[in-house]
Amino acid sequence: ILYGCGDVVDDYEGIGGPAGLIGVGGAGGAGGDSAVAGVIGGAGGAGGAALLFGAGGAGGAGGSGGGGSVAGDGGAGGNAGLLAPGLAGGAGGGGGQGFDTGGAGGPGGDAGLLVGSGGVGGAGGFGLTTGGPGAAGGDAGLLFGSGGAGGAGGSGRTDLGGAGGAGGKAGLIGNGGNGGAGGAGGNGGGDGGPGGAAFGLGNGGNGGNGGTGTSAGSPGAGGAGGSLIGAEGLPGLLP
């Protein structure tokens, strides 16, 4: 209860175990692959959350889909502990590869209540027709920390690329996360994800680039700059 990390779970749709008061959340297990036509791949398990001091566990990757089916989605990253200084939420798992549609990435975990950065959103999986969408990055702590970057959209071979995920929101001091790039598509590219907003001293995240295709995807909008320094942000001051 007081010390210890969650177990790493490795079974079909396994969920990472929660940590003690001091420890890291367990990673989510990968979803099982499907070898049967028309059967969806298993979803990745969510990463376990930390309680007070510790980072969140990473989400598991989605399993690949059987012939003509959809891949499993990536699991969500676990949230960091409430008082975890400087530790990020867990990264979201990537979507699996699909013979039809790629799986969606799992969202990044949020930082602790006050200090820490958001976890990176998982990337969308490749699809023979349509790419899976990237997931949103996690939000930072209220006082210090930057938002997590959005995951990139997966590529779609014959149709559309997946959209990029949105960047996470920053804390009072920190930058918004960058939006994920849209995936390339044989027909049309996926749209880039919007950048996350900054609230005080920090820059808004950059919007993700649109994916390439017969018709290119639209770039994502940039996030708003912090209110203490104006919409232009303050380049170079914050990492």
Segment roles from a protein language model:
Residues 1-239:
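Long, compositionally biased tandem-repeat segments
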